[in-house]
Amino acid sequence: MDFIKGLWRDLRARPVDTLVRWQEQRFLWLLMAIAMGGLIILAHSFFQIYLYMAPCEQCVYIRYAMFVMVIGGVIAAINPKNIVLKLIGCIAAFYGSIMGIKFSIKLNGIHHAVHNADPDSLFGVQGCSTDPTFPFNLPLAEWAPEWFKPTGDCGYDAPIVPDGVTLSSVQQWFVDLYQQSEGWYLLPPWHFMNMAQACMLAFGLCLILLLVMSGAWALKLARGK
């Protein structure tokens, strides 16, 4: 508690210098890499493999954006005081968060369209492909199909358990929970915050933090001149 109070006291007293000092430490960069890497592992290992929620085209694009941020965080964490490494990390983090927001917004629009009672809501909505085209034409679906090959339909993320599969009691509980809510929600019984919205929140928070940190760094460099 005293540690947190100390951080808050430093931030209030010298905000720019404190923010610059924070980004010159490995903690924040590793935190970003671990957080985004953890979300990728959670989506793949728990929801896709354990609960049989097949990823759609936009889902694997979101994973790509998170993976870029993981790489950026790791590169910057090698030596955050090195301007080149930190700049590479910042560019990768900004790119990943912006692209992630873009993919999440598109998936959210598709989700609302397919779950809308009005059939006209689907008019003009582009469907999902099982043959993704990643930025820079990266063949991620060929390199790591388990992680980046879409096998589901956009907007439909309820568990689909293959015939003949025997579920454990824990699996059955989660599968029933998400099937009854007709998809993934942060709070399934109340349909609160679908997967696309949760991803938007994660990317948005990262983007805000990056903007604040980069702004402080730019001010520090400007003052140094």
Curated annotation (Swiss-Prot):
Membrane-spanning ranges: 27-47, 65-85, 87-107, 199-219
Membrane topology qualifier: Multi-pass membrane protein
Domain of life: Bacteria
Subcellular localization, as worded in the UniProt entry: Cell inner membrane
Gene Ontology, cellular component aspect: plasma membrane
MF annotations from Gene Ontology: protein-disulfide reductase activity
An annotated GO BP: protein folding
Keyword Cell membrane: yes
Cysteine disulfide partners in this protein: C56-C59, C128-C154
Keywords tagged on the record: Cell inner membrane, Cell membrane, Disulfide bond, Electron transport, Membrane, Oxidoreductase, Redox-active center, Transmembrane, Transmembrane helix, Transport
Chief location: membrane
PANTHER family xref list: DISULFIDE BOND FORMATION PROTEIN B, PROTEIN-DISULFIDE OXIDOREDUCTASE DSBI
Subunit structure: Interacts with DsbL.
Family: Belongs to the DsbB family. DsbI subfamily.
General function of this protein: Required for disulfide bond formation in some proteins. Part of a redox system composed of DsbI and DsbL that mediates formation of an essential disulfide bond in AssT.
Protein name as annotated: Protein-disulfide oxidoreductase DsbI
